[in-house]
From Swiss-Prot:
GO biological process: ERAD pathway
Signal peptide span: 1-22
Family that this chain belongs to: Belongs to the LCL2 family.
Protein's name according to its UniProt entry: Long chronological lifespan protein 2
């Protein structure tokens, strides 16, 4: 028969150390792991995806290689008939407002009121913002 104090201590230690071990696993995954690696353990490195270039050459090559017989939108590389027909880059979170004379701008939807961006643009045009 085991002593109840020893059993209780063992159970409490197990319960207290399990979340700590889980947290260290979380930090290993978040920060790339291997920080506390000991010799003898083998760490398999997967080939990491390469970041896109930090200069404009990739974009320029995409722009120059795009096939478009009308107007090629610089922000989305969409082919449209007129510049003000260009879609917003992030249509799910942006609204487009046409300013007239073939000019259109995109801005955050705001999230509260339908057409909020358009109303703000109109207020700014009137000098109220």
């Amino acid at each position: 028969m085991t002593n109840p104090t020893i059993l209780l201590t063992t159970v409490l230690l197990t319960l207290l150390t399990t979340p700590a071990l889980a947290q260290f696993g979380f930090f290993d995954q978040m920060f790339g792991g291997g920080g506390g690696q000991q010799q003898g353990h083998h760490h398999h490195h997967e080939q990491e995806a390469q970041n896109v270039r930090s200069d404009a050459s990739w974009y320029q090559s995409q722009y120059e290689g795009a096939q478009c017989t009308h107007y090629l939108c610089p922000g989305t590389l969409s082919c449209v008939h007129f510049p003000h027909h260009c879609p917003c880059s992030w249509e799910t979170v942006e609204d487009k407002v046409e300013l007239g004379e073939g000019i259109a701008v995109c801005g955050s939807k705001g999230g509260w009121v339908e057409g909020e961006f358009g109303k703000k643009v109109e207020m700014a045009r009137k000098g109220l913002l």
